[in-house]
Structure formats: structure tokens, C-alpha cells
Amino acid sequence: MTEQGYITRTIEISGRTFSVDIGRVAGQASAGVLARYGETVVLVAATREALREGLDFFPLTVDYEERHYAVGRIPGSFMKREGRPGEKAILAARLIDRSIRPLFPRNFTQDVHVVALVMSVDQDCSPAITAILGASVALTLSDIPFAGPVGAVIMGMVDGQLVVNPTLEQDEKSDLHLTVAGTREAINMVEAGAKEVSEEIIVEALTKAHAEIQRIAEWVGEIRAEVEPLGLAHPKIEVPANEPGPELVEAVRSAGYEKMRAAVHHCKNERLDKKSADRHLEGTKAEIINAVLENFPEEEQRLKSLVDKLEKEAVRELVLKEKVRLDGRAFDEIRDISVEVNVLPRTHGSGLFQRGQTQVLSVLTLGAVRDEQILDGLDTQETKRFMHHYNFPSFSTGEARPIRSAGRREIGHGALAGRALEAVLPGEDVFPYTIRIVSEVLSSNGSTSMASVCGSCLALMDAGVPIKAPVAGIAMGLIKEGDEVAVLTDIQGTEDHLGDMDFKVAGTEQGVTALQMDIKIAGITPEILAQAMAQAREARLYILDRYKEVIPGPRPEISPRAPRIIHTTIDPEKIRDIIGPGGKIIRKITETTGVDIDVEDDGRVFITAPDPEGGKKALEIIKTLTAEVKVGEVYLGRVVKIMDFGCFVEVIPGVLGLPGKDGLVHISHLAHNRVRKVEDVVREGDQILVKAIGFDNQGRLKLSKKEAMEPPAGGAGETGRPGLIQDDRPDRRPRSRFSRR
């Protein structure tokens, strides 16, 4: 222990030091630690409230708060302080929540609040991983009952090699970004984005990740044993058993077991849809409750809980013992699929995907570069050109609730589907559009996020976006009792609710592009995940084949209703020629052609035009404004001014009422013979060939008419007078400016 009264413990993870300060911060919390990974620092505090009676769920809240001072920035908002968490922060909070939630006792109903405050960010050391590990230590040291500790790592794949916790540079090159959390015994959370990585590599990465997780979890467990005698770890509180009496349990079982089994079999035999099955099962549960309630009038809440458990037992028994599902399907059977495109005629692209009673309409919009989302988070990325937004209205589940703004679930599902598609999107150099897809869930009965992947892929192809390959997604489920395991393909809502796992897999024919696993039990092994991924691949290939029946690939042209974007690159030094003083020139271009123009600092120019002609006209104007006269090139120019010492010739015409680029043809360069008067050779308005021969010391263009012409045969001059040749006197330069402004 230090003189300040706290201790620090460290462990090496992927060549960098992870440490926790214990007893240093957040003394009023149940436990608080200062977690440090490299130069990333996250304060994590865990607190609990007193027992709340009558709850049938665990009220866990996880907040992940980003502070802009962590990267030396001031927030960009008007108030100059942090507001509601951004998308990245919400996704990080969900990672922590999903890593720890399965490890609390089932009958524990006290409010638990875990706060991760990001205070310093080293881009090579993930603050999300730091927060998960900090939460693991805090919960392990607290008095909150917790079946941890938890470890977590990110797996990358750089140049074909798996890397634990890749640095920022490695992550940018990586084909895989796989976040894994778990205990010493098993994995309980997976989240991944990938570039068509094979299932075998994913399983190998999970196995390697779990080995590192076991080492970290072991270290956290040792910390508790070490600091408990010092008073820095608290005895775990007792969780009230709150178990119903044996008489009530027996009464429910006697009155309801056979009825519930019969109800479940009726749903299976009749292959009832969600509404019909729910109505039948709820009716059966009400019968059982009414039959028992008259003998136990004060036990209504426990009675309802027991009947729910009876339903769960009957459904799980059907699967494990009879090898068939509630709706009569086999374990690897997919519900009926419907695929449509071009559903909405005035949009840029749309896809309607239905699997059973899950239905999602995805709508795509193509926009200009200026439509990119501006990010104000802690990452180095400043803008985002692809957005996927997911909406889940109440009518999709048959409920009558007000529609609210997007919550954590909607943001999480939208990000997952977006991640699944990012790997196949064309680069900005090929397709310089901002892409926004909105997935509207119209009906929900399991796996709406994966239906959003399918609907969004259809919308991309319908819009003519040149994706590398079509993507499909499927949700896998698990029912596990002891050593008995059933992996289910394409789970519906009831199987999600009563099962042990929701494992979502998306990808192409070549490999996986996204993964997400939510689990309700303490963990599962890599072997079970491998089986789930193998079944998911078969389902994915089946869905991709169904796409081909309707739309075999992206349309050859983008939607006629989408804007046209023309991309060109100019010398960054020429940007001022497009912008003009106070933006005068660029405004004139947009007003004249009806286009939008975005100019990047590196010289990339994007012209967004509602019609092709306007875009072409704007491009020509920009090319003219930024054109360079090359020494040695011959130009067809127009004489714009006659002077005693020569003439000015415009070699690049002006546009939008602006002057073009001109230069001086000195009288000595008008002809091979001696010229006494400029008007003897040219007149104002004449079109003549001239050659660019250089620039004077003030950067003014010098042109030559005689060098653009063949020398006269036999030495005769243009006037036919033999023997007259160009004298060797140097050019005389007047003091007046050569270029017209």
C-alpha cells in the first residue's frame, strides 16, 4: 500500500501495462478503481441500492461517459460541454452491460449502477476494453454479488496474423475487429466487424481470446484475495432466496404441467404464428393461475413467476427431448422468406425483406460529401460517410405505445447492421457518395437486426451502389441444459425470450462481416460457437440464393432520382482559384449550374449535380479556372489586345465573366521575319496558334507565334522578302502588367 493509502496492481496485456489503483478514488461507491491501459485512463465505479420488492427483472444500468478533455479538446456544441452520449459511447456501454449482466444472480433485484468515466485516451489502448476490465475489478471488490471476474480483449488480424489488442495503426490495417469478454470458464460476449473473414479464423480468434481472458480473470481474482485483508474488498451481501413454498410449487406443477405441455404441443402441431401462439399460451397460463390462485390468494406474484417458468420448461423440453421447435421447425430450418426491391418509387433505393413474421423495409438515400456525419467523439475519425439507422415502432409488436427517439437498443441494432455492410461498400475514390440507410421494422418476431442487414443490402443493390458482394444475416439461438445442447437457426421471439443465447452472424458467400452474441447463462464454449457459425453459414448462403431470384447484383446504373457526383482532383494551390475572394467564384459556379461543390484541403473536388448536364458544365468551369499553361505546348488563342511592343493572346478562355489566362507575344516573336508593326501580322479578335515559351521573373506568361509555326523554306520571311531573319536582340519588357484581371 502506498503512503496515500491505496494500492496499484499491474498486468501485461499485449506488450502494454494494464493497472488498477484500488482505494484511491470514488470512496463513497460500493467500489471504485482507476483503470489505466497505456495512457488510457478510465474511472469505474459500481454502486447498488437497497432491495426493491416485486421486481421480476434485474435493474442494471451501465453508463459510459466520454470527456473531451481526455483527448485535449473542447466540445463543439454551443454550450461547450458534453451532452447526451454519442453513438460510440452508447455502444461501449452496451459492451460493458452485455459482458457483466449474465453474471449476477437470477433472483437479485437491487438496482446496480456501473459508471465508466473516460478521462484520458491513448488511441493505441482501447478505452472500452479498459472500462470492461475496470468494471470487472470494481464489481469483484464490491459487496455486490457477482459471479466474475471478467476479462476482455480485442482480436485483430493483420497480414494474416491474429493480434491481441491491436494498436490504432494495426487496427486500421486489420481485417478483423473482434471484441470478446468472458470468465475463466467460458465466453459470454462477442461483438465483431470483419472483412469477409472465414468461420475457421473467427473460431481460432475466439479460442486465442479466451486463453488471454482466462489469464486476466485469474489476475483479477488474485487481487481480491490480496486486498481483502487490507479492507479494500467487501464481503458479498446475501441474496434473499425469495423462493416460493413447496406447497405452491407442487400446486402449480400438479395443475399446470400437463396443460402447459399440451399447449406447447398444440402450437407445434398447428404451426401457429406468433399472435396465435402467444394467445394460446397466455390463455393456458391464465387457466393455471386461476386454478391455483383460489388456494393461494396472497401469492399472485410468485404464482405468475412459477407459471412462466413452467412455460419455459415445456418449450425447452420440447426442443431438447423431442428435437422439434415450438413452431414445428427443425433445428436448422429457416422460416419462409420474401424479397422485394424498388418498393418506394421516389426514393433512391429500397428493399423489403420478410422472414416469417419479421418484416423490415430498408430505404437508401445517396447524398453529397457535405452530407457526411460530423463526429464529435474521442476518436481520430472526424466524419462518417455511411450511416445505418434502425427504427423499431411499437406497432411492429402489436403494442400501443408512443413513439420515442432512438434508444440504446435501436442504436445498437443500427450499428450492428451497418457494421455488417461496411466491409462490402465501395471506397470513396470509386463511389464518392454519402450513404444513409434507414431500416423500418414493420413486424417483429425475432432477429429484426439481421432482417435489417438483408433489407439494407437489397436497398444498396436496388440503388445501383457497386457493393463488392451481397450480405445476409441470420440469428442463431441456444438451449442448453447440462450437457444437452440445441443450436437453433433463425430464432423467433419466443425462442429468444426462453432460450440461452442470441447469436447474430452476417456475411457474404466468402466470409463473415459482423457478429454479435447476447447470452443469458454464465458462458458458452468455443465449440458451441463453432457449431452455431457453421449452421449460420448454411442459412446465410440460402438467403443469398433467394436474393438472386429477385436481384442478382447491383443495378448497372445508380437510381435516376439520385444526384450525380463528379470527382476530380486539382493542385491544392489552385483551390483559391475555385473559391475566389469571400467565396464569390464558387457561389457563382453553383448559381450558374445548379450544383453543389465540396472542395477538400488535399485538392479533391466533388460536384453534386441534380442532372448530368449541370455537373458536366461545372466540371468544365473548374477545369478552366484551374488549368495551367504548360511551357512547350502550342495553344489556339485569341488576340485580345494590341500594343506597340506586341499583342496579348488569351490561351485559356475566361468563364462566368471572369478573365481567362493570357500572355504576351512580343513583336519579335510574331513572325520569323522582322515585324515593324504588330497590325501587319495580327488584328484584335484573330485566332492564332501560339507556343508557351516561359514566364518572366514576375511570373507572367510569354508566348511565341513564330515558334508555333514551321520555319519558312529557303529562309524567306512571311512577307516573301528573302534574307530577313529574326534578330538576336533581347525581348523588351514594358512595365505594365501582362495579365488581365
Swiss-Prot record:
Domain KH span(s) in chain numbering: 563-622
Record's keyword terms, sorted: Cytoplasm, Magnesium, Metal-binding, Nucleotidyltransferase, RNA-binding, Transferase
Pfam families on file: KH_1, PNPase, RNase_PH, RNase_PH_C, S1
InterPro entries on file: ExoRNase_PH_dom1, ExoRNase_PH_dom2, ExoRNase_PH_dom2_sf, KH_dom, KH_dom_type_1, KH_dom_type_1_sf, NA-bd_OB-fold, PNPase
GO BP, sorted A to Z: mRNA catabolic process; RNA processing
PROSITE patterns (UniProt xref): KH_TYPE_1, S1
Enzyme class: transferase
Enzyme Commission number, as recorded: 2.7.7.8
GO MF annotation: an example: RNA binding
Domain S1 motif: 632-706
Subcellular location: Cytoplasm
GO cellular component: cytosol
Cofactor(s) recorded in Swiss-Prot or TrEMBL: Mg(2+)
Region (Disordered), start-end ranges: 703-741
Catalytically driven reaction(s): RNA(n+1) + phosphate = RNA(n) + a ribonucleoside 5'-diphosphate
Residues that, per the record, bind Mg(2+): 496, 502
HAMAP family: PNPase (MF_01595)
Protein family (similarity comment): Belongs to the polyribonucleotide nucleotidyltransferase family.
Function field: Involved in mRNA degradation. Catalyzes the phosphorolysis of single-stranded polyribonucleotides processively in the 3'- to 5'-direction.
Protein name per UniProt: Polyribonucleotide nucleotidyltransferase
Originating organism: Desulforudis audaxviator (strain MP104C)
